[in-house]
Amino acid sequence: MNDKDLKEEKDEKYSKDDKSDNEEKERLLRQIELAKCELLKNKPDDIIEPKDIDFRKNLPIEDPYLKSHPDLYEKMQKDLKRLIYRSHLPIFDPSCYEIEKKIGEGTYGAIFRVINIKTKKKYAMKKIITNNIISLKYLKSEFEISYQNIHPHILSIYGINIKCFDSHTFSLCVLMDLGDKDWDVAIAERLRNGKNYTEQELISIFKQLASALIYLQRDKKIAHRDIKPENVLIFKNTIYKIADFGEAKATKYNNKINTLRGTDIYMSPLLYNGLKASKEDVQHNLYKSDVFSLGYTLLYAISLNYDIINELRDLDDSQKIKKILYEKLKPRFSNNFIEVILRMINPDEKTRIDFIGLEKLIKDLL
């Protein structure tokens, strides 16, 4: 084959790759547009913009202490306005909803199933009580990330409501999509029923979650930092969405960070070893840490328990990890699927793939 033929072959290969990339981008754009349409369809009619809110409804006007301290009342009103105006989140009216049932309890508050009194549509409402306005700002940022990043596999947020109960107690209510259950609950049900996931089921779930995380890295420069089954919600039995962006970090200028974040069992080796050594700072690549956590999340779903993770947890030899994984997963899973997981849980961060590399690997192997 002469140089001209080689050049033509290379050009043809690049042309096919470009075409494939463009088709993938178009497919993602179509998915995002559909997600936006779904969001608009489900948007409650009580949602208003921050500029239209009557702040007096959200302040404890009758509080005796505030009545005798008008300067404090004025400060609270300013704090509340600042919180809402700077949030870029619409406001919803909790009085338009009836609480049906408490469906969950998180670190910062309870989650309820609520029904819109007028439309009868059901939603989830998270309610957080705090006496620290700084922590309120931090918690609010979690929901801003979800609201601003519309994707078919990221939980939809419709609005918030911030209220003062007295001179120092605030509540933050968040209205969002109502899922059937979180993935951790579904995995526990499978364990009780003795029903393992098939490879095709896991590939479908994996592709959904990976598409959201690829989108966050490539298009938004955001890392989640706490990927685990508890932070994945299931809709209609087959649709999986990432939730809980409380630890998420924008990485526009730097994708390495020193802070330790995440849940220890799903942490990358750098973070896990740092935690064991009681280190406060561990420099690591945020995206590659998320890839590792997603890999361990898949292993948990495969075994329906922590057995495989516990066996691999303290290993730093890639060949030993590979040997164990093949012994545990063959013949239930194909070589291609096992190889994808191995690339994700590579103990060496330098050679572990990020989500952009994972996107290509999914195309090539799955």
Model-derived regions, located:
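Juxta-kinase regulatory segment immediately upstream of eukaryotic protein kinase catalytic domains
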Residues: 40, 44-92
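Conserved N-lobe ATP-binding subsite of Hanks-type protein kinase domains
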Residues: 110
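Short beta-strand micro-motifs within the conserved protein kinase catalytic domain, predominantly
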Residues: 156-172
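Conserved short submotifs of the Hanks-type protein kinase catalytic core
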Residues: 168-182
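Activation segment signature within eukaryotic-like protein kinase domains
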Residues: 205-206
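Catalytic-loop of the protein kinase fold
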Residues: 217-235
